[in-house]
Structure formats: C-alpha cells, structure tokens
C-alpha cells in the first residue's frame, strides 16, 4: 500500500508532459481533485471491513490493497512519449546547476515540509482521537474524512488562484494555514476543534503541495 501510494503521487508529473505550461496548475489540480473519492471511500471502507477477519483491521488493509491494484488497468492504455536519450543524459549531468535554481529549491522544500507536517498530524490524529480521546471509530473517521476533503476539494480552484496571485502568495497562505491548524489543535481540544484544525491542515497542504509541484514543473 505504501509503495502504491508513493507512485500515485508521481502521476501529477505525467500530466504536464501533455499540456501547455499555462495549463499546468489547473491540470495538476484535476489530478489531485480525484483524491476526493478517497475521502468518501477509504474512511468508510476501513470501518466496514475492519472486522472481516479475526484480527481487527486486517480486512481494511486487504481492501485497500485491492484498490491499489486498480490503476494498473488504466496504465495498460497509457502511451509514453518518446524520450531523447542524449538530451536526458545532458540534463542529468547538469543536476547540480539545476538545483542552484532558487525556484526549484523553494518547490522542493515547500513540498517536503508541507507533506511532512500534514502526514505527521494526520497519522497521529486518528490514533489520538480514538485511543486517548475515546471517540468512536465512526466519529474519528468523520474527522479524517473532513481532513481529506480539505486536502483535495480546494483543487477545484487552487490552480486558478496560482494563476491569479502567483506561486509565492499561495505558498505563504498554505504555511499560515498549517500554523493555524497547529494552533487550533493545541488550544481548542474539542471534537469541533479537531475537525476544524484538520480541515485547515488539509487546505494548507493542498496549497503547498500543488503550488510546489506546479512551480517545480514550470521552473
């Protein structure tokens, strides 16, 4: 499941190869927007299949493993573009000069930090809410669903915001949203507080992740 998840995130870099640079942010937004399906499917399936076997949650992981295989069916119909080998070697040899580009450094740092903060809080939240705060699996799954919706629903307009305000403004906004999420989760430890905090966490991640990805491509 982890390996499949890591590869799925690379799909957003395949899209810019087939569209104009001006359309890159919006095209990548469409890819991330499909993640909204996971908010409706994954959380409910985890609760539905958790008692499928004697060991709790084994059924949930089996179901997710099956869903991870679905993209293979679509990839059979994907035709890769021909790559100029000489050009690829030339670009690879210039990797050091490429990394001197401040925009590329900014995109790597923002994407990495944004994902680290989001993944750390999201992963800990599900355990914290269910085990320490003693919310039910259903209540916990609702909070996680809201978080995932916050992660992907903004993709409807994030691409347009990037085109209108630029990469830097959206990156700063994403950072402020992450700080707001941390503040709310620390000082408003109620069910509603956790829900709002995780929604802001998702939106902040979306701004940082999508903006850094688009910035990396156009740089």
Regions found by a protein language model. Name each.
Residues 1, 186-198:
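Helix-loop junctions at membrane interfaces in 12-TM secondary transporters
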């Amino acid at each position: 499941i982890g390996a499949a998840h890591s590869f799925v995130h690379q799909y957003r870099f395949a899209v810019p190869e087939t569209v104009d640079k001006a359309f890159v942010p919006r095209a990548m937004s469409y890819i991330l927007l499909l993640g909204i399906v996971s908010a409706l499917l994954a959380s409910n399936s985890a609760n539905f299949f958790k008692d499928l076997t004697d060991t709790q949650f084994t059924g949930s992981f089996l179901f997710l493993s099956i869903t991870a295989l679905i993209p293979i069916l679509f990839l059979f119909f994907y035709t890769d573009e021909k790559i100029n080998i000489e050009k690829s070697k030339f670009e690879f040899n210039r990797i050091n000069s490429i990394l001197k580009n401040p925009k590329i450094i900014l995109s790597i740092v923002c994407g990495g930090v944004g994902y680290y903060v989001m993944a750390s809080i999201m992963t800990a939240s599900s355990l914290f809410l269910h085990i320490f705060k003693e919310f039910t699996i259903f209540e916990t799954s609702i909070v996680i669903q809201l978080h995932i919706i916050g992660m992907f629903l903004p993709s409807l307009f994030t691409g347009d915001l990037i085109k209108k305000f630029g990469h830097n403004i959206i990156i700063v906004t994403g950072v402020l949203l992450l700080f707001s999420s941390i503040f709310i989760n620390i000082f408003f430890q109620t069910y509603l507080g956790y829900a709002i905090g995780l929604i802001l966490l998702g939106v902040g991640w979306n701004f940082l992740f999508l903006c850094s990805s688009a910035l990396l491509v156009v740089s």
